[in-house]
Swiss-Prot record:
Name this polypeptide is given: Large ribosomal subunit protein bL36
Superkingdom of source: Bacteria
Record's keyword terms, sorted: Ribonucleoprotein, Ribosomal protein
Gene: rpmJ
An MF annotation (GO) of this entry: structural constituent of ribosome
BP terms from Gene Ontology: translation
Species of provenance: Deinococcus geothermalis (strain DSM 11300 / CIP 105573 / AG-3a)
Database matches in InterPro entries: Ribosomal_bL36, Ribosomal_bL36_sp
Length: 37
């Protein structure tokens, strides 16, 4: 899980979603997991 000020999709499988007021990126590739913080 990377914590970034700006989350971006890194590949076609990445999805940008909002959970509990946080912006997250979930992906089949574990290295692409990000959250905004």
């Amino acid at each position: 899980m990377k914590v970034r000020s700006s989350v971006k999709r890194m590949c076609d499988n990445c999805k940008v979603i909002r959970r509990h007021g946080r912006v997250l990126v979930i992906c089949t590739n574990v290295k692409h997991k990000q959250r905004q913080g």
